[in-house]
Amino acid sequence: METPRPVVSRRPFCCTLKCFVKFLRLVVTVTSMIFFIVGQAPEPYIVITGFEVTVIFCFLVLYTCGLDKIMRSFFWPLLDVINSMVTALCMLIVSVLALIPETSTKTILGGVFGFLTVTCTIADCALMCQKLRFRPRQPYQKKSTNDIDDRE
């Protein structure tokens, strides 16, 4: 008689560290955008930051609703890592440009929060890179023949 297999339940995305980092990234980017808007920063700063907010929100919805498991035509972790790298580069440039000239205090705060966005983006990219590893984190352990027979 077969023994029933235990059902492996995964934690929902909203209860993971990746969700926390993405949500923190979203909040910091929105804060940076608000400071750019209130400080009347140049339009490219606001547009780039707003675009990043939109993309982060879309990835949050994608992972929270489980659409990445339904739409298998894309390799979502790779797209997320590429997005994180582009975001880090763009926000780093915007933040440096916001801090260089003599600008208002609110624009400077937008630049500082932009640097925090870059930090959160790098952390998010590091977490997503773990999914892209081809080799497992633990060393490979050869299973005995009894373990193989139990799974069948």
From Swiss-Prot:
Q: In which tissues is it expressed?
A: Ubiquitous.
Q: What is the protein name given in its UniProt record?
A: Chemokine-like factor
Listed under GO cellular component are: extracellular space; membrane
Keywords per UniProt: Chemotaxis, Cytokine, Membrane, Transmembrane, Transmembrane helix
Please list the GO biological process terms of this entry: lymphocyte chemotaxis; macrophage chemotaxis; neutrophil chemotaxis; secretion by cell
Give the species. Answer: Mus musculus (Mouse)
Briefly state the protein's biological role. May play an important role in inflammation and regeneration of skeletal muscle. Essential for embryonic development.
Q: Where does the protein principally reside?
A: membrane
Consequence of gene disruption? Mice exhibit embryonic lethality.
Q: Which terms does the record give in the GO molecular function aspect?
A: chemokine activity
Q: Which residues cross the membrane?
A: 19-39, 46-66, 81-101, 108-128
Q: List locations, semicolon-separated.
A: Membrane
Entry's PROSITE patterns? MARVEL
Q: Where is the MARVEL domain?
A: 13-133
